[in-house]
């Protein structure tokens, strides 16, 4: 492990928006705990909050952000807020869904993603066209996708969109490399967000990971986060404990050796922690 004191904690998207390189995810946060946990994450230094309509906590996330900014005299523009469209359907349903998200959040959206390509080509393209209009109005600052495979991305590019996707959020960790999608995104300047980067905690005691982390004198969680960062991804992590929030964010003052990054990358098993199926291969 080597120290890296000058590493940036943000990255610039293709549209010029600056996004923090680590996000705090609100997936499966209990409704009655979400406000406190998002507030705690902001107190811990997170400036990137990731929610979605299907999480059922957009209203709590939005209120926590607005309240925290007011209490701490922080500009709303200093916080990066992501939400997602639950389902691709038709143009008008997508517009209604976006208006609903904006209402629940009580603030503009920095990044809005199509959460799943499910629904078919016609629905995907119609949903994207609707999203673009909210970029024009300023209610959404950036648009992107989630769980898009290469064919879905190619389809979107072929539709001659007004705005190209800034981000593709997919499941990524050493046990699921998604090399074809990663390569396509990198070649088209699409930032890659990694969800389930800590494997939902399932592999934190993995016999392959534990000795590597021990040798580097870091936690397995920090090892996985550094792997994600050094691969060029933006990990979306979640924790309900303050000490874990802090340690998971304390990863910008060191790097792991390139050979360790390569070793971790060799662990690919096409194993999904977040789902029992591959959402990137739907028609």
Swiss-Prot record:
Site positions per UniProt: Lowers pKa of active site Tyr: 84
Keywords for the protein's UniProt record, in alphabetical order: Cytoplasm, Nucleus, Oxidoreductase
Transmembrane segments: none
GO biological process, one term: arabinose catabolic process
Subcellular localization, as worded in the UniProt entry: Cytoplasm; Nucleus
Principal place of residence: cytoplasm
Active site: 55 (proton donor)
Pfam families: Aldo_ket_red
Keyword Cell cycle: no
GO MF entries: aldose reductase (NADPH) activity; D-xylose reductase (NADPH) activity; L-arabinose reductase (NADPH) activity
One term under GO cellular component: nucleus
Record EC number: 1.-.-.-
Annotated family: Belongs to the aldo/keto reductase family.
Official protein name in the record: Uncharacterized oxidoreductase P32A8.02
């Amino acid at each position: 492990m080597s120290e890296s004191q000058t590493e940036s904690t943000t990255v610039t998207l293709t549209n010029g928006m600056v996004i923090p390189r680590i996000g705090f995810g609100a997936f499966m946060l209990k409704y009655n705990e979400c406000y406190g946990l998002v507030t705690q994450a902001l107190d811990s230094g997170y400036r990137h909050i990731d929610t979605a309509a299907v999480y059922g906590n957009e209203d709590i996330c939005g209120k926590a952000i607005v309240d925290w900014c007011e209490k701490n005299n922080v500009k709303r523009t200093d916080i990066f807020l992501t939400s997602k469209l639950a389902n691709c359907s038709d143009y008008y349903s997508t517009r209604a869904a976006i208006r609903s998200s904006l209402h629940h959040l009580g603030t503009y959206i920095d990044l809005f993603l199509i959460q799943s390509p499910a629904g078919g080509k016609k629905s995907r393209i119609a949903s994207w066209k609707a999203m673009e209009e909210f970029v024009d109005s300023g209610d959404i600052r950036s648009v992107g996708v989630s769980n898009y495979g290469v064919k879905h991305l190619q389809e979107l590019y072929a539709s001659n969109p007004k705005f190209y996707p800034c981000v593709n959020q997919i499941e990524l960790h050493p046990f699921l490399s998604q090399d074809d999608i990663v390569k396509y995104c990198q070649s088209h300047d699409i930032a890659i967000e990694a969800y389930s980067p800590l494997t939902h905690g399932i592999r934190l005691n993995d016999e392959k990971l534990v000795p590597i982390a021990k040798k580097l004198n870091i936690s397995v969680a920090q090892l996985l986060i550094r792997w994600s960062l050094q691969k060029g991804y933006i990990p979306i992590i979640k924790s309900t404990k303050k000490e874990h929030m802090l340690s998971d964010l304390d990863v910008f003052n060191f790097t792991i050796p390139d050979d360790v990054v390569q070793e971790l990358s060799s662990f690919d098993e096409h194993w999904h922690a977040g789902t029992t199926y591959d959402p990137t291969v739907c028609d």
